[in-house]
Amino acid sequence: MDSKWAAVLLLLLLLRNWGHAEEAGSWGEDQVFAEEDKGPHPSQYAHTPDRIQTPGSLMRVLLQAMERPRRNPAFLFQPQRFGRNAWGPWSKEQLSPQAREFWSLAAPQRFGKK
């Protein structure tokens, strides 16, 4: 857990310094080279600030990666364990008709503090 927080703190510090570097105009040299290379090469290879992800999108990706794994969605669709027809049809060998009605209405009870 501590290593995750250390990684987040390091990333925040890097993003903070990255924002200061952008304000200082560190992209000037890259833009000059991108303008010189525009001739035979497509513009997708030019290294310009528009193509770089914003700090907000980087933070969103980081937070999504740190989310705890959730329960499998199939867990919500478990078959009913109690109530009428929970165990399928009754055979003659199992219970009498009166007992069958009684046990078909059985439901789990919650014991403890209310």
UniProtKB/Swiss-Prot annotation:
Q: Which residues form the propeptide?
A: 22-69, 85-100
User: Phenylalanine amide-modified residues are where?
Assistant: 82, 111
Gene Ontology terms: biological process: acute inflammatory response to antigenic stimulus; excitatory postsynaptic potential; maternal process involved in female pregnancy; negative regulation of appetite; negative regulation of heart rate; negative regulation of insulin secretion; neuropeptide signaling pathway; positive regulation of blood pressure
Look up the record and report any one GO term of the cellular component aspect: neuronal dense core vesicle
Q: Does the keyword Secreted apply?
A: yes
Question: Does the entry feature the keyword Signal, yes or no?
Answer: yes
State the residue spans of region: Disordered.
Answer: 29-51
Record's keyword terms, sorted: Amidation, Cleavage on pair of basic residues, Neuropeptide, Secreted, Signal
Q: Where in the cell is it found?
A: Secreted
Annotated signal sequence is 1-21
One annotated GO molecular function is: G protein-coupled receptor binding
User: Main site of residence?
Assistant: secreted
General function of this protein: Morphine modulating peptides. Have wide-ranging physiologic effects, including the modulation of morphine-induced analgesia, elevation of arterial blood pressure, and increased somatostatin secretion from the pancreas. Neuropeptide FF and SF potentiate and sensitize ASIC2 and ASIC3 channels.
Q: Which family does it belong to?
A: Belongs to the FARP (FMRFamide related peptide) family.
Query: What is the protein's name according to its record?
Result: Pro-FMRFamide-related neuropeptide FF
Please report the organism this UniProt entry assigns to the protein.
Rattus norvegicus (Rat)
Q: Which gene encodes it?
A: Npff
